[in-house]
């Protein structure tokens, strides 16, 4: 296996703190394919699952919706998002995501700089 290629089946799954019915896989992060400047995560949230309100103090986050629909709350305002929508969370901006009825919410998530650990938000 090439050191710059990550195979999904080789990545362990985890549920971040403050998230329910969520499964994430770190595709690119320090310690995987060698990136030190950003992190790429594939996430899935089942219907009714959510990322509780939180903010990332040291990192920016971009979330691209691959499948499903979600209610996204950003600084107290809520909007519905679906496939092909991109959500951007600047550092320190409080946000939450709730998966809506239908297929699981599948997300491609980018953090810059990377989170220090999958257990830290």
How should these model regions be labeled?
Residues 1-37, 119-120:
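A short, N-terminal "cap"/entry segment at the start of jelly-roll beta-barrel domains
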Residues 26, 41-56:
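Conserved short histidine dyad/triad with adjacent acidic residue
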Residues 30, 51-57, 98-100, 119-120:
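Short histidine-centered beta-strand/loop micro-motifs
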Residues 42, 88, 103-118:
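A short hydrophobic beta-strand segment most commonly corresponding to one strand
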Residues 53, 72-73, 89, 95-102:
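Short beta-strand His + acidic residue motifs that chelate non-heme Fe in jelly-roll/DSBH
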Residues 58-60, 64-70:
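Glycine- and acidic-residue-biased ligand/ion/polar-headgroup-sensing regions
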Residues 76-91:
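Short acidic-glycine-tyrosine-enriched beta hairpin
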């Amino acid at each position: 296996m090439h050191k710059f290629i990550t195979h999904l089946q080789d990545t362990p799954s985890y549920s971040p703190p403050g998230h329910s019915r969520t499964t994430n896989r770190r595709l690119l992060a320090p310690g995987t394919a060698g990136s030190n400047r950003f992190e790429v995560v594939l996430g899935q949230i089942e219907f009714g699952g959510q990322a509780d309100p939180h903010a990332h103090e040291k990192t920016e986050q971009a979330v691209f919706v691959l499948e499903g629909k979600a209610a996204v709350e950003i600084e107290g305002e809520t909007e519905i998002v679906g496939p092909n929508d991109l959500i951007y969370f600047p550092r320190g901006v409080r946000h939450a995501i709730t998966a809506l009825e239908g297929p699981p919410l599948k997300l491609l998530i980018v953090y810059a700089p990377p989170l220090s650990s999958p257990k830290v938000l």
